[in-house]
């Protein structure tokens, strides 16, 4: 079974990071991807889905952070690759670059692992991500923090050279994603700086993957879905000769229009979550504007 023919919403790997990928988004939105038609029967087990995506130097999994089923799938992906001896490393958006478990033994305690990764439980509940991390540690595989350290974010905001890391089309797509991702509530003057942070984070994750690469094995990156699209995310910063596979996890009964083959290699659906107004939550958490 290939990634193109598997009945679990896989789409044939397409043009990767090239500019034409951006141009295809409009067409994908209108026509969709025929391989994304929900199957009549249950999808194959996770090990079979993973096998359909191999070989790969890097396997990027874009999740919805508040979907427990996504973290369960991620753990199963780690276990499947580890069981085959094909897991090189696990990289995480949820920990900062420079933190890793390389000095820990497979029998390390969860407390030791959390300390080694500088884990921030307030931002990333260990209850959700601990099983994913420990599956790698217990398999004797290193876990790397991949996110841009918070201390470097301020400098990234003013680093205009980051704009040139993406093509004009991809940069605009990233700016639009930042704008809508913040519920159109950001002043336009903040779109550029916030986009640079996103680019810097994607580049940091890509650098971590490259450093963890091991011939014949796969490095897995677990991140939010916003970091994984081929057209503007982490894949944009990876060498073109590397075999990169991207999986989008979607908590929905049907994939979105932007989940076509130019963006992801496979889309795995999980049960929809209860309705939630994320923009209302975001706006409620923002400080009130000062009175004029």
Where are these regions (language model features)?
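Generic beta-sheet signal
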Residues: 56-59, 88, 217-223, 244
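N- or domain-start disorder-to-order transition segments that initiate the globular core
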Residues: 24, 28, 32-56
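Zymogen propeptides
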Residues: 48-83
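C-terminal regions of proteins
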Residues: 210-213, 227-292
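Short internal beta-strands
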Residues: 89-95, 246-250
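Membrane-embedded segments
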Residues: 67-69, 89, 97-102
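Bacterial N-terminal signal peptides that target proteins for export
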Residues: 4-22
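A substrate-binding/cap region within the structured catalytic cores of diverse enzymes
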Residues: 101-214
């Amino acid at each position: 079974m290939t990634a193109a023919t598997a009945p679990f919403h896989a789409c044939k790997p397409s043009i990767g990071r090239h500019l034409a990928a951006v141009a295809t988004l409009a067409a994908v939105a209108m026509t969709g991807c025929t391989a994304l038609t929900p199957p009549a029967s249950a999808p194959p087990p996770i090990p079979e889905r993973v096998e359909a995506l191999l070989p790969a130097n890097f396997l990027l999994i874009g999740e919805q952070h508040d979907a427990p089923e996504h973290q369960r799938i991620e753990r199963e992906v780690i276990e499947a690759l580890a069981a085959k001896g094909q897991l090189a490393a696990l990289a995480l958006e949820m920990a900062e670059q420079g933190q890793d478990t390389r000095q820990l033994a497979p029998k390390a305690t969860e407390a030791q692992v959390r300390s080694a990764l500088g884990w921030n439980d307030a931002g990333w509940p260990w209850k959700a991500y601990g099983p994913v991390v420990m599956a790698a540690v217990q398999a004797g595989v290193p876990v790397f923090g991949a996110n841009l350290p918070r201390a470097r974010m301020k400098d990234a905001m003013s680093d205009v050279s980051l704009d040139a890391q993406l093509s004009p089309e991809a940069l605009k797509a990233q700016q639009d994603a930042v704008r809508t991702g913040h519920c159109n509530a950001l002043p336009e003057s903040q779109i550029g700086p916030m986009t640079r942070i996103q680019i810097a984070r994607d580049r940091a994750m890509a650098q971590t993957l490259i450093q963890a690469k091991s011939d014949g094995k796969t490095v897995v990156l677990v991140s939010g879905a916003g970091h994984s699209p081929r057209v503007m995310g982490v894949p944009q910063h990876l060498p073109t000769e590397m075999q990169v596979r991207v999986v989008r996890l979607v908590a929905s009964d049907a994939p979105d229009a932007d989940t076509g083959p130019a963006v992801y290699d496979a889309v795995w659906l999980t049960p929809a979550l209860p309705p939630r107004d994320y923009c209302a939550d975001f706006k409620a958490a923002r400080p009130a504007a000062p009175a004029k």
